[in-house]
């Protein structure tokens, strides 16, 4: 996860204990580990690579908040990411934004995710991204790309923390606090058992 604000409810729900603090905070119990990588692609890529190299997980789940680029996605609802688009990383030959396909579990509402290093606060900017993706974050693509490089399965679940009507930092932080407990409970009850069916899985 990117921030302690998002991770706190997971740490509480799963009763995780701090395992290490550097180079990234890592918490664990007897089934899962959670790493707080920081905001943005570079931080997420470094944290994911470190985590895979150190623990060799069977799979990784990138979870946390994402903004809705339109009114189709409901504030507080959770979506499973089926495709990731990077508007700020065009293919060098075609100029088309790079796309990635993460691993997917059946039975969950799906969404396309846009990942870029700059937050989406401008209304026009959000409208442009909505033509490609329904949700937007700053980490998902980097996590999935590193997992792909290391041949580690990657799943992404995001809850909606802001919509075109909720664009101030104060509103986003308020909504993350408001919905993070519901998100962590949903993940632990509905998602984690699916990931743990055959073997332990790393968060």
Which ranges hold each PLM region?
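Glycine-rich phosphate- or other oxyanion-binding loops that anchor nucleotides, phosphorylated ligands
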Residues: 23-203
């Amino acid at each position: 996860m990117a921030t302690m604000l998002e991770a706190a409810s997971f740490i509480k729900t799963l009763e995780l204990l701090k395992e290490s603090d550097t180079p990234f905070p890592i918490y664990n119990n007897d089934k899962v580990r959670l790493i707080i990588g920081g905001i943005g692609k570079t931080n997420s890529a470094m944290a994911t690579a470190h985590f895979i190299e150190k623990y060799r997980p069977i799979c990784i789940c990138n979870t946390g908040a994402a903004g809705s680029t339109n009114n189709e996605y409901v504030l507080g609802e959770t979506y499973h990411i089926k495709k990731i688009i990077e508007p700020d990383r065009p293919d060098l030959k075609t100029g088309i934004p790079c796309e990635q396909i993460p691993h997917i579990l059946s039975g969950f509402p799906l969404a396309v995710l846009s990942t870029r290093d700059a937050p989406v606060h401008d209304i026009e900017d959000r409208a442009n991204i909505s033509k490609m993706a329904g949700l937007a974050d700053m980490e998902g693509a980097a996590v999935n790309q590193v997992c792909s490089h290391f041949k580690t399965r990657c799943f992404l679940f995001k809850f909606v923390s802001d919509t075109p009507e909720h664009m101030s930092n104060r509103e986003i932080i308020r909504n993350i606090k408001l919905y993070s407990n519901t998100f962590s409970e949903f993940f632990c009850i509905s998602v984690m058992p699916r990931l743990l069916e055959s073997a332990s899985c790393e968060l």
